[in-house]
């Protein structure tokens, strides 16, 4: 199985306004099939006021610029007709500040007030987030404070209230009825206060629905494993970082340690990736990787157990350094051609934000023999021929050599030997010659 993460606004335009939309996604299906994609993960498509969409103001309507329900259903049908599943990003930890529920709560409606989390006399109003020390409690003009783990524009939902739980289950049922195949659950480890409570929440929430459930649990292995048994698919942040760090530092030790933590002996499918919307792009890691190292990183990604996931544009070597608060740079328009005015091309409305496309576009890279795009297409073809690798076991054959990474992938009588060369010179392992920054599979 091969996944592909898409920021709809930047991917492909279907109505000539320069903004990606559902009709545009239909027009991109032939490319995604050629790339070997089995499912697409669409970042939030619901009504919201932000560019990223994680502050939903209505779970039953879509961003107007993306299209309406008819467009959405037609897009789903087109993907299914071509054998591609659709996974939606569903941020149910909170709503947007302008959601009807929160606006009614602000006006004093006791029913909707209980949909959110409010400070009591015992609340520590100086409580901070663990990852960046930002405040969690936010004041209103009347002196009340509400909880917003992800900022004042994203008030937390109160899942101690069973009505909130049922409201969000209705959203899930509605989307499944429209043909959605699964969900990526944002901030999945933050639904409840403790690990035990959080696991219990998700076990109950998912108990009567089927699909591809992909969880964002950015945490240590124990926490990931506990949730993995429920979700079935877990984003593997550990190995994602260590692939890039190993290639950047030219030392495989850190990757071997990560594989042992995050890929060995799991009863769920780790979903491996090289970048996403919450970090710098692969080609910009630590200031920038050479094209050779980008290719090697992708070779490693596609020769590990688990599900490989491509962040749109990584297959082209798109660049972008993640810096708050302006994180749009990692969500740049996807370059279909060298000419920004051609059909399907998206662009930012502010000309200064549009990056030059030269040498990065699909059009250019399909013609370039040694391009990153053709490199990754070789590996997606390899995975198509070896579906068993998703659940393969990994056996290390060479753990001491920092520039040579050798392992065997095994599953029910089938096996492959993988050799990665992280040096700038040819290396030999058991008679097999491996070119600089290259991979051989035997």
UniProtKB/Swiss-Prot annotation:
Keywords of this entry: Calcium, Carbohydrate metabolism, Cytoplasm, Glycosyltransferase, Metal-binding, Transferase
pH dependence: Optimum pH is 7.0.
GO biological process: oligosaccharide catabolic process
Active site: residue positions: 186 (nucleophile), 216 (proton donor)
Positions annotated to bind Ca(2+): 13, 15, 17, 19, 21
Organism from which the protein derives: Thermotoga neapolitana
Protein name: 4-alpha-glucanotransferase
Gene name in the database record: mgtA
Cofactor(s) needed: Ca(2+)
